[in-house]
Design a protein with these regions (language model features):
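12-transmembrane solute porter fold
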Residues: 15-37, 50, 125, 231-235, ...
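Small-residue (Gly/Pro/Ala) motifs that create kinks and tight helix-helix packing interfaces
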Residues: 39, 152-164, 218, 290, ...
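Helical transmembrane-bundle signal
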Residues: 61, 95, 180-183, 217-220, ...
Length: 491
């Protein structure tokens, strides 16, 4: 049955929906953030080089970014709750495989399977809220969802550090199993089903395959570029060709996975370009920072995770309010100021070296980063969702998430290459510190580019497109389709 569009806050029905969506999205967020803190220990236990650690992050991002559009479309057509529950179940089973992995190769393969589950559950969590809540309460509902999601992302590094030092890094993945055992029954009992009655036609499997192939080939070429071989160069060219073919197929397909018409909304296009800049910087920053604190500053996994906790307090206090603020003043200022604050935080991280003092070297940067995230998170998602028809909530969520994950994927693959890291860099404090100091200005520059783009192109949403996909709902205010991951490497 169709989801009732009139669920209000605060009611028991609203609380059950929020509990389900927060639990589901938190599985993906926690997994992304806790993994970064565990990377050094994973490398030691599995005798893995830096490229294997990159793939531990990127295998997940690759399948997530490649299939998240398909996941949103599946939810719109077959039922958002049904696909969400399938995604949570798949994610939990893949997490179990990660936790039992005997080698880095098996772990990477299981991480790729995790990304498939993430692609099914991630767009569904926000789409369920969008389809279930009354328009007057959507801003608060998504703000609450974003706030708890941001808290989960911020707590992730602390939790990951505690798990690594306690029961072991494998529990970083096994933790998802009990979360799924809670989430699935609640969803089946208390969350109404919803779908898009306009969804029809054939699935764009060729588009999905070409998109995945393009991302996989380009990522492989970036990770392996240090070899300087002809095979790597040909792989990169093949990836570009697959990307061009993807664009061609999407323009020709009767039912494309990525409908070109949705980009008829200038606002939607602009905010996704900003997303690419922001999440590329976040992806590189959080991947490298988790290693910098442990390899160079000498922090234990628990101490490195605990260092990120100031962002938790800021997200808890202000995330639920930031969506409403953006609704009043428009998204242009928050989407400009937020990236600039985050860029300043990345430059402040240059103070973190050997024997870094937390109060004077680490904390100031993380406080500024938290302020930037709070400023940016809610308006980003609010603007994305306000730029499309609510019936295409799953598609819009998928596109923005795909942009965020693809940006993080490329950043994690490219930054070690751009900064001169080799496979053993994370085992040497001096070598890693030098690369980190080259990487932070690059990430900051990308954020500044995003801020300039936001100031130049983003406006208060107003209808300007005849396509149903491009209708805007100015009363929808919310956060990034996934809050930024404070331990990862992008959302």
């Amino acid at each position: 049955m169709a989801a009732p569009p009139g669920t209000h806050l605060p009611t028991p029905a609203a609380r059950w929906i929020l509990l389900t969506t927060v639990l589901g999205s938190s599985m993906a967020l926690l997994d992304s953030t806790v993994v970064n803190v565990a990377l050094p220990r994973i490398g030691e236990d599995l005798d893995a080089p830096l490229t294997a650690l990159q793939w531990t992050v990127n295998a997940y991002l690759l399948t997530l970014a490649s299939l998240i559009l398909l996941g949103g479309s599946l939810g719109d057509r077959f039922g958002r709750r049904r696909i969400f529950v399938l995604g949570v179940t798949w994610f939990a089973l893949a997490s179990l495989a990660c936790g039992l992995a005997p080698t880095s190769g098996v772990l990477i393969a299981a991480r790729a399977l995790q990304g498939v589950g993430g692609a099914l559950l991630t767009p569904g969590s926000l789409a369920l809220i969008q389809a279930s809540f009354h328009p007057d309460d959507r801003a608060r509902a998504v703000g609450i969802w974003s706030g708890f999601g941001g808290i989960g992302a911020a707590v992730g590094p602390f939790l990951g550090g505690w798990l690594v030092e306690g029961p072991g890094w494998r529990w970083v993945f096994l933790l998802n199993v009990p979360l799924a055992l809670i989430c699935v029954p609640v969803a089946l009992r208390h969350v109404p089903e919803s779908s898009d009655e306009r969804a029809h036609g054939r699935f764009d499997l060729s588009g999905a395959a070409l998109g995945a192939l393009a991302l996989a080939l380009v990522t492989y070429a970036l990770v392996e570029a240090r070899q300087g071989s002809l095979a790597v160069a040909l792989t990169a060219l093949a990836g570009v060709a697959a990307g061009v073919a993807f664009v061609y197929v999407e323009h020709r397909a009767a039912d494309p996975m990525l409908p070109p018409s949705i980009f008829g909304s200038r606002q939607f296009t602009a905010v996704n370009l900003v997303t690419l800049c922001v999440y590329a910087a976040f992806g590189g920053f959080f991947f490298l920072t988790a290693l910098q604190l442990q390899v160079v500053a000498g922090y234990s996994p628990l101490a490195a995770g605990t260092a990120m906790l100031p962002t938790t307090a800021l997200m808890l206090l202000f995330s639920a309010r930031s969506g409403a603020l953006a609704e009043r003043i428009g998204p242009r200022i928050p989407l400009t100021l937020g990236p600039l604050l985050c860029a300043a935080a990345m430059l402040l991280m240059l103070r973190v070296g050997e024997d870094a003092a937390y109060p004077t070297d680490v904390l100031p940067a993380l406080l500024v980063m938290g302020a930037g995230m709070v400023t940016l998170v809610a308006p980003l998602t609010a603007t994305v969702l306000a730029s499309v028809d609510s019936g295409r909530a799953g598609l819009a969520s998928g596109i923005n998430n795909a942009a965020a994950r693809a940006a993080g994927l490329v950043a994690v693959a490219a930054l070690p290459l751009l900064t001169g890291m080799d496979d053993e860099a994370y085992r040497s404090a001096g070598a890693f510190d030098a690369a980190f100091r080259r990487a932070m200005p690059i990430c900051a520059a990308v954020l500044v580019a995003g801020a300039v783009l936001a100031w130049s192109t983003v406006r208060r949403p107003v209808p300007d497109c005849a396509h149903p996909e491009c209708l805007r709902h100015g009363n929808v205010t919310a956060p990034p389709l996934e809050p930024p991951r404070t331990g990862h490497g992008a959302r």
